[in-house]
């Protein structure tokens, strides 16, 4: 019979305030630099998660879905914020209204207002929303590790991350959906091929770096006859 062990060292809770690591192609880029992480390597929190997944090396994947609603931009929204649904009047929880309170710690509420306010991205939180919208990998067996945002698997309203069957010597595959109207199904194919020894890795998140940070993302395009094809989402693809 399952029973909760209240004080087990592996018990931990991830919230919208938890420190997390950014990996993959967006790590260290201008897209994710904020006042909190001027180098663009870390962020805070995961929110409105829905669906899940897992890896052959024993980590848990959680999917950030309806996260755009927690932010507000009262200025000029960039195209990605307009398309994905960041609001212009208030966040759905109005967390930004608690900014400036005497109990606020490290801009924990200020960051939900992504309006441009400073001279550069490292002076404000204009890029805070860009640190959300990812598959987040968690090592459930090591409570000292940070949750890791795998930016290579795409940024959208993630719903589920289902793995294909791992076959030694072949790339690993995960299938994902965007849980919004008229959106897409996605497939991630790792560059690295599966080594069955990695199922018993001593460092699960490093193994995640191997298979989840480098690869190819595809979107499904369906035809009227019910067939379809996978389109590579790359600037090297002339269709894109």
Briefly describe each language-model feature range:
Residues 1-240:
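Conserved small-residue
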């Amino acid at each position: 019979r399952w029973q909760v062990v209240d004080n087990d060292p592996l018990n931990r809770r991830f919230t919208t305030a938890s420190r997390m690591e950014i990996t993959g192609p967006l790590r260290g880029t201008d897209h994710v630099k904020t006042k909190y992480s001027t180098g663009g390597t870390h962020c805070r929190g995961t929110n409105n998660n829905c669906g899940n997944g897992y890896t052959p090396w024993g980590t848990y994947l959680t999917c950030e879905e309806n996260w755009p609603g927690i932010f507000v931009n009262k200025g000029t929204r960039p195209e990605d914020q307009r398309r994905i649904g960041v609001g212009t009047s208030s966040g759905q929880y109005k967390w930004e209204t608690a900014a400036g309170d005497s109990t606020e710690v490290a801009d924990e509420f200020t960051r939900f207002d992504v309006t441009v306010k400073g001279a550069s991205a490292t002076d404000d939180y204009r890029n805070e929303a860009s640190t959300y919208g990812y598959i987040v990998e968690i090592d459930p067996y090591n409570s000292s590790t940070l949750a890791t945002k795998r930016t290579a698997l795409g940024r959208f309203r993630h719903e589920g991350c289902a793995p294909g069957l791992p076959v030694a010597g072949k790339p690993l595959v995960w299938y994902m959906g965007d849980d919004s109207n008229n959106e897409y199904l996605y497939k991630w194919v790792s560059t690295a091929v599966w080594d069955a020894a990695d199922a018993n890795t001593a460092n699960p998140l490093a193994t995640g770096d191997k298979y989840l940070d480098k690869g190819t993302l595809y979107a499904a395009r369906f035809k009227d006859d019910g067939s379809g094809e996978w389109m590579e989402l790359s600037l090297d693809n002339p269709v894109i």
